[in-house]
Each structure stands twice: as structure tokens, then as C-alpha cells.
């Protein structure tokens, strides 16, 4: 499941997806609140979303569609509140009048450095979301 932005919707979608009998990964889209705590786009704390998954049979959670600069803060919360596998696929870019603008995005080399840091923290899966192009993934492949 991608872009889980609120807990209630996540739980409903998780139940439906698990009815397939296939393993279901859950990807959270996050940003810091005014106090700097990592939250889903709904404003619900990431730690609460992780707690809601307890006992639900989810093997992996992803920090996804989240700014590169916010990933480590998200991983701090995940490290404290999650015992399963972890993935990261961050985004880079800006929303301008409802449209993505990819001027001044992170360079492929800098994304690879960030990805290596996430891998060093123990994540299991790394990729890219909006604004992360094949060139970025090519650089990441060199540091895996």
C-alpha cells in the first residue's frame, strides 16, 4: 500500500489487500508537524500509525513520498516503534500551484550518499519516488 496518509484509511485498505492472501507492505507519506515530529499527511503521529499495524502481519513498512531531508527523522521513529523490515523511497521536488516542479532536485550522487546512509542504518529496501530518476537509481546501485 502506498501513500498511507491516515490511519483509518490504512487499516481499511490493509484488510482488503490482505484478503488477497499476498504479503502487504505499507508505505507512509510523512512530513514534520510544527513541533518537528514526523507525522502522516493527516497530522497523525508516525508512531501511532506503526502501533496500529501491531499484530496485523505486515512484514515491511516503507518511508515513501517523503522529502529526503526528513527520512532520517522518520527512521528514528521507525527504529523505536517497529520490529519488521524497513524500506525507503524518498522524493525530491516542490509543489507549485498543485504541480510538481523538479528544479533544484537532489543530485543523483547526493541521493546515493543519502541512500547509503539509510542502508547503513539497516534498512532492507531502497528506491525512489517523485523526482528520483533512473540516474539517481543508477548511482544508488553503485553504493549497495
At which residue positions do the language-model features occur?
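Domain-level signal for soluble alpha/beta catalytic cores
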Residues: 1-144
Amino acid at each position: 500500500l502506498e501513500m498511507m496518509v491516515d490511519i483509518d484509511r490504512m487499516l481499511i485498505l490493509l484488510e482488503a489487500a490482505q484478503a488477497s492472501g499476498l504479503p502487504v507492505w505499507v508505505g507512509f507519506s510523512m512530513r514534520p508537524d510544527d513541533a518537528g515530529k514526523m507525522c502522516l499527511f493527516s497530522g497523525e503521529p508516525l508512531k501511532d500509525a506503526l502501533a496500529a499495524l501491531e499484530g496485523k502481519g505486515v512484514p515491511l513498512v516503507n518511508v515513501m513520498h517523503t522529502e529526503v531531508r526528513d527520512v532520517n527523522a522518520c527512521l528514528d521513529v521507525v527504529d523505536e516503534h517497529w520490529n519488521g523490515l524497513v524500506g525507503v523511497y524518498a522524493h525530491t521536488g516542490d509543489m507549485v500551484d498543485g504541480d510538481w516542479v523538479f528544479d533544484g532536485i537532489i543530485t543523483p550522487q547526493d541521493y546515493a550518499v543519502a541512500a547509503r546512509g539509510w542502508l547503513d542504518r539497516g534498512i532492507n529496501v531502497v528506491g525512489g519516488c517523485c523526482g528520483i530518476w533512473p540516474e539517481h537509481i543508477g548511482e544508488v546501485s553503485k553504493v549497495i
